[in-house]
Amino acid sequence: VRQAFVGGDRVTKSALVVVDVQRDFCEGGALAAANTLSLLPPLQKFVAEAKRQGALVVFTQDWHPANHSSFKANGGPWPVHCVAGTPGAELMPPLKAGAEDVVIRKGVSVNGAGYSGFDETSLHQELRDKGITRVGVAGIATEYCVRATALDALKAKFDTAVLDDLIRAVQDKEVPHVLAELRQVGVKLSNSAAWLAAGK
Protein backbone atom coordinates (compact mmCIF):
# COMPACT_ATOMS: atom_id res chain seq x y z
CA VAL A 1 0.00 0.00 0.00
CA ARG A 2 1.41 3.37 -1.00
CA GLN A 3 1.57 5.72 1.95
CA ALA A 4 0.07 9.16 1.95
CA PHE A 5 2.24 12.13 2.85
CA VAL A 6 4.60 11.22 5.68
CA GLY A 7 5.90 14.17 7.62
CA GLY A 8 5.34 16.38 4.60
CA ASP A 9 8.52 15.14 2.93
CA ARG A 10 7.21 12.59 0.45
CA VAL A 11 5.68 13.08 -2.97
CA THR A 12 3.27 10.14 -3.18
CA LYS A 13 0.68 12.19 -5.06
CA SER A 14 3.18 12.72 -7.88
CA ALA A 15 3.91 10.62 -10.96
CA LEU A 16 6.98 10.92 -13.15
CA VAL A 17 6.02 9.88 -16.69
CA VAL A 18 9.09 8.92 -18.72
CA VAL A 19 8.04 9.01 -22.36
CA ASP A 20 9.49 6.64 -24.96
CA VAL A 21 13.15 6.45 -23.93
CA GLN A 22 13.59 3.46 -26.22
CA ARG A 23 16.44 2.17 -28.34
CA ASP A 24 14.88 3.23 -31.64
CA PHE A 25 14.50 6.83 -30.42
CA CYS A 26 18.10 7.11 -29.17
CA GLU A 27 21.34 7.56 -31.10
CA GLY A 28 21.83 4.67 -33.48
CA GLY A 29 18.12 3.84 -33.52
CA ALA A 30 15.68 3.85 -36.41
CA LEU A 31 14.12 7.20 -35.50
CA ALA A 32 16.63 8.87 -33.21
CA ALA A 33 16.06 12.19 -31.48
CA ALA A 34 19.00 14.54 -30.93
CA ASN A 35 21.48 14.26 -28.05
CA THR A 36 19.65 11.42 -26.37
CA LEU A 37 22.69 9.71 -24.89
CA SER A 38 23.36 12.78 -22.75
CA LEU A 39 19.83 12.43 -21.36
CA LEU A 40 20.34 8.95 -19.95
CA PRO A 41 22.61 9.54 -16.91
CA PRO A 42 20.62 12.46 -15.42
CA LEU A 43 17.32 10.77 -16.20
CA GLN A 44 18.37 7.51 -14.56
CA LYS A 45 19.54 9.43 -11.49
CA PHE A 46 16.30 11.39 -11.31
CA VAL A 47 14.13 8.29 -11.68
CA ALA A 48 15.91 6.79 -8.68
CA GLU A 49 15.51 9.98 -6.65
CA ALA A 50 11.83 10.32 -7.55
CA LYS A 51 11.22 6.76 -6.38
CA ARG A 52 13.17 7.38 -3.19
CA GLN A 53 10.89 10.30 -2.41
CA GLY A 54 7.75 8.28 -3.04
CA ALA A 55 6.75 9.27 -6.57
CA LEU A 56 5.17 6.77 -8.91
CA VAL A 57 7.29 6.18 -12.02
CA VAL A 58 5.61 5.42 -15.33
CA PHE A 59 7.46 4.36 -18.48
CA THR A 60 5.66 4.68 -21.81
CA GLN A 61 6.76 2.69 -24.84
CA ASP A 62 5.77 2.83 -28.47
CA TRP A 63 4.77 -0.78 -29.13
CA HIS A 64 3.70 -1.02 -32.74
CA PRO A 65 2.58 -3.96 -34.85
CA ALA A 66 4.83 -4.59 -37.86
CA ASN A 67 2.12 -3.30 -40.20
CA HIS A 68 1.48 -0.07 -38.28
CA SER A 69 -0.15 2.67 -40.33
CA SER A 70 2.48 5.26 -39.34
CA PHE A 71 5.25 3.40 -41.18
CA LYS A 72 6.30 4.71 -44.60
CA ALA A 73 5.76 1.31 -46.19
CA ASN A 74 2.10 1.63 -45.19
CA GLY A 75 1.70 5.24 -46.33
CA GLY A 76 2.68 6.86 -43.03
CA PRO A 77 5.37 9.46 -42.26
CA TRP A 78 7.86 7.40 -40.26
CA PRO A 79 10.43 4.67 -40.81
CA VAL A 80 9.72 1.35 -39.13
CA HIS A 81 10.36 1.81 -35.40
CA CYS A 82 9.56 0.28 -32.01
CA VAL A 83 7.95 -2.87 -33.36
CA ALA A 84 6.49 -4.86 -30.48
CA GLY A 85 8.92 -7.36 -29.02
CA THR A 86 11.96 -6.16 -30.97
CA PRO A 87 15.19 -4.74 -29.48
CA GLY A 88 14.32 -1.30 -30.85
CA ALA A 89 11.21 -1.16 -28.69
CA GLU A 90 13.10 -1.89 -25.46
CA LEU A 91 13.82 0.80 -22.90
CA MET A 92 17.25 2.26 -23.55
CA PRO A 93 19.79 0.99 -21.01
CA PRO A 94 20.52 1.78 -18.27
CA LEU A 95 16.81 2.55 -17.82
CA LYS A 96 14.84 -0.42 -16.62
CA ALA A 97 11.31 -0.68 -15.29
CA GLY A 98 11.07 -2.12 -11.79
CA ALA A 99 8.26 -4.24 -10.40
CA GLU A 100 6.82 -1.18 -8.65
CA ASP A 101 6.73 0.91 -11.84
CA VAL A 102 3.90 1.25 -14.34
CA VAL A 103 4.65 0.38 -17.97
CA ILE A 104 2.28 1.77 -20.59
CA ARG A 105 2.52 0.49 -24.16
CA LYS A 106 0.94 2.68 -26.80
CA GLY A 107 0.31 2.64 -30.52
CA VAL A 108 -0.47 -1.06 -30.21
CA SER A 109 -3.27 -1.15 -32.79
CA VAL A 110 -2.59 -0.88 -36.51
CA ASN A 111 -4.19 2.56 -36.79
CA GLY A 112 -3.53 3.88 -33.28
CA ALA A 113 -1.31 6.97 -33.49
CA GLY A 114 -0.04 6.46 -29.97
CA TYR A 115 1.71 9.80 -29.58
CA SER A 116 0.23 10.32 -26.12
CA GLY A 117 0.72 7.99 -23.20
CA PHE A 118 -3.02 8.43 -22.58
CA ASP A 119 -4.10 7.46 -26.11
CA GLU A 120 -6.03 4.16 -25.95
CA THR A 121 -4.19 3.11 -22.79
CA SER A 122 -4.95 2.57 -19.10
CA LEU A 123 -2.72 5.44 -17.95
CA HIS A 124 -5.48 7.80 -16.81
CA GLN A 125 -7.12 5.06 -14.73
CA GLU A 126 -3.78 3.87 -13.31
CA LEU A 127 -2.97 7.38 -12.09
CA ARG A 128 -6.44 7.97 -10.62
CA ASP A 129 -6.43 4.59 -8.88
CA LYS A 130 -3.13 5.47 -7.20
CA GLY A 131 -4.33 8.88 -6.02
CA ILE A 132 -2.01 10.82 -8.30
CA THR A 133 -2.72 14.53 -8.71
CA ARG A 134 0.59 15.81 -10.16
CA VAL A 135 2.31 14.61 -13.33
CA GLY A 136 5.83 15.46 -14.47
CA VAL A 137 6.62 14.54 -18.06
CA ALA A 138 10.14 13.73 -19.28
CA GLY A 139 11.63 11.85 -22.22
CA ILE A 140 11.47 11.75 -26.02
CA ALA A 141 10.49 13.47 -28.27
CA THR A 142 9.61 16.95 -27.08
CA GLU A 143 7.61 18.00 -30.13
CA TYR A 144 5.73 14.72 -30.52
CA CYS A 145 5.06 12.26 -27.71
CA VAL A 146 6.17 14.44 -24.78
CA ARG A 147 3.95 17.26 -26.05
CA ALA A 148 0.96 14.98 -26.65
CA THR A 149 1.30 13.26 -23.27
CA ALA A 150 1.55 16.58 -21.41
CA LEU A 151 -1.50 18.00 -23.20
CA ASP A 152 -3.56 14.91 -22.40
CA ALA A 153 -2.45 14.94 -18.76
CA LEU A 154 -3.60 18.55 -18.51
CA LYS A 155 -6.88 17.70 -20.24
CA ALA A 156 -7.39 14.93 -17.68
CA LYS A 157 -7.11 17.57 -14.92
CA PHE A 158 -3.70 16.58 -13.57
CA ASP A 159 -1.37 19.32 -12.34
CA THR A 160 1.02 18.90 -15.26
CA ALA A 161 4.62 19.96 -15.79
CA VAL A 162 7.17 19.25 -18.50
CA LEU A 163 10.61 18.72 -16.96
CA ASP A 164 12.59 20.82 -19.39
CA ASP A 165 16.02 19.52 -18.35
CA LEU A 166 15.00 15.92 -19.06
CA ILE A 167 13.52 16.09 -22.56
CA ARG A 168 15.00 15.66 -26.02
CA ALA A 169 13.60 16.65 -29.42
CA VAL A 170 13.96 15.37 -32.95
CA GLN A 171 14.63 18.96 -34.01
CA ASP A 172 15.95 21.28 -31.31
CA LYS A 173 14.71 24.34 -33.20
CA GLU A 174 11.13 23.24 -32.48
CA VAL A 175 11.57 23.19 -28.70
CA PRO A 176 10.96 26.89 -27.92
CA HIS A 177 7.72 26.88 -29.93
CA VAL A 178 6.47 23.68 -28.32
CA LEU A 179 7.27 24.82 -24.79
CA ALA A 180 5.63 28.20 -25.43
CA GLU A 181 2.49 26.44 -26.67
CA LEU A 182 2.40 24.17 -23.62
CA ARG A 183 2.89 27.06 -21.23
CA GLN A 184 0.14 29.03 -22.93
CA VAL A 185 -2.46 26.31 -22.36
CA GLY A 186 -1.49 25.74 -18.73
CA VAL A 187 1.26 23.14 -18.66
CA LYS A 188 3.99 24.18 -16.25
CA LEU A 189 7.65 24.16 -17.24
CA SER A 190 10.09 23.18 -14.54
CA ASN A 191 13.47 21.64 -14.03
CA SER A 192 13.27 18.21 -12.48
CA ALA A 193 14.65 19.06 -9.04
CA ALA A 194 12.24 21.98 -8.59
CA TRP A 195 9.28 19.85 -9.67
CA LEU A 196 10.11 17.14 -7.16
CA ALA A 197 10.63 19.67 -4.36
CA ALA A 198 7.32 21.37 -5.14
CA GLY A 199 5.44 18.14 -4.51
CA LYS A 200 6.42 17.89 -0.86
Report the location of each language-model feature.
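Ser/Thr/Pro/Gly-rich low-complexity, intrinsically disordered segments
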Residues: 1-2
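Active-site acidic carboxylates
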Residues: 5-108, 124, 129, 133, ...
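Histidine-anchored nucleotide/phosphate-binding helix
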Residues: 46-47, 147-155
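Active-site rim beta-loop-alpha module in soluble metabolic enzymes
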Residues: 107-118, 149
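Short, small-residue-enriched loops and turns at beta-alpha junctions
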Residues: 111-114, 167-171
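A short, well-ordered alpha-helical element
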Residues: 120-122
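Glycine-rich anion-binding loop/nest that anchors nucleotide
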Residues: 132-145, 162-167
